[in-house]
Amino acid sequence: MQLHEWNARLHGLVVFRALLGDPVVAKLAALTDRLEAADDTIAPLCDAVAAFEAALFAHTTNLGDYLSNAVLETETFCVRQAAAGQLSPVMEAALNSELSFLQKLCGLTLDALLEAADRQSRELAFLPRWEARQLDLTAAYNQRMREAGKKGYGMFAKHHVFTVENGQLVPVKYPDPQKLSELPGYEKEREKVIANTRALLAGSPANNVLLYGDAGTGKSSTVKAIANEYAADGLRLVEVKKNQLYQIPDLMDQLAANPLKFILFIDDLSFSSNDDNFAALKAILEGSVGGRARNIAVYATSNRRHLIKETLTDRTGDDIHEADTRQELMSLSARFGLTVTFQRPEKARFAAILEELAKQHHIQMPMEELLVKAEAFAIRAGGRSPRVAKQFIEQCESGVQK
């Protein structure tokens, strides 16, 4: 290809238009622009080459590797249409044409680019040369589209945990690495949540889930560990704060057509009796705004069985339908299809949790001594719980507890 062809095809991307916003690809486009400019000055060309290579080398020395990853992770209207089984012939032709060009671009070297521009490569002999290799991008991209239900596309291919900011999903780059295998105890309770999640992943009817119980019993850790465990199967977690509940219907609309499965996670949920967020959650759980998409479930944790903070003032108010109002508030938890209770561990369960954690952390202290010290630690910490057990074991590991 001649230089003007490289430049025109790069600037003429339609399906993969978003690539031009990628810092490395943008620098490559600037380099081809510089080469095509009627200017024999060497310094601006050196600047363009060096700027591109500096951007590329921050990630890899191989242009083909970088471009192939960028292409496979870019969210396009073609992959969205294909995921919905609606890819038109026009879009398919445009997709294949651009993939063919991008495949050639993966193999482009600096010397080949200079040759296409009729420039002498010896002029830039002092500059490093990036590596390049052609890949079968068409086959790889078609495979990615077929696997969109598990691997996703765009930011969903790179991340599996998200938060919400100003109504938009924001990836969490370093999510909690909690594993199910690291959560001893509460296996029966946890299995109910896992079974419901598997149903969601299978496309079967799945319940909204309320994980209720004492603080530190592993409710939040269970949800996060499940998200990590099943990320490779197409599960994504969206953490929603209580003051963002009103945004959930819009989030559901955004995610309903996505081939992945989503848990909308509300941690430490509770309401006061006059909380506007109560009505928002009620509408979501009842589906009054519309039918809930089968690829989405709401998981919430709470220390309160009925989610409502009741005060004496609430009970002595002037609501003439006080009993009905209180019952309405109390019944919110019943609108979750599945409620799983995590109670404080009794002594035997606490001991079993400690023993398993001690094995995981390679604590050598005799078990009887460990239990005595852990019980004393739990009294000072406010009572037995898996969180307290973990804190104690970590202190043993660090040498604080001897």
Regions found by a protein language model. Name each.
Residues 343-402:
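C-terminal alpha-helical "lid" subdomain
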Residues 256-257, 272-319, 324:
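Conserved catalytic/switch belt of AAA+ P-loop NTPases
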Residues 208-238, 250-256:
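Walker A/P-loop
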Residues 175-208:
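Pre-Walker A (pre-P-loop) alpha-helix and adjacent loop at the N terminus of AAA/AAA+ ATPase modules
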Residues 198-199, 243-268, 279-290, 323-327:
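Conserved alpha-helical scaffold flanking the Walker A/P-loop in AAA+ ATPase domains
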Residues 318-330, 337-351:
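Conserved AAA+ ATPase "SRH/arginine-finger" region at the nucleotide-binding site
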Residues 1-184:
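AAA+ P-loop ATPase mechanoenzymes
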Residues 244-246, 269-272, 298, 302-308, ...:
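Conserved nucleotide-binding/hydrolysis micro-motifs of P-loop NTPases
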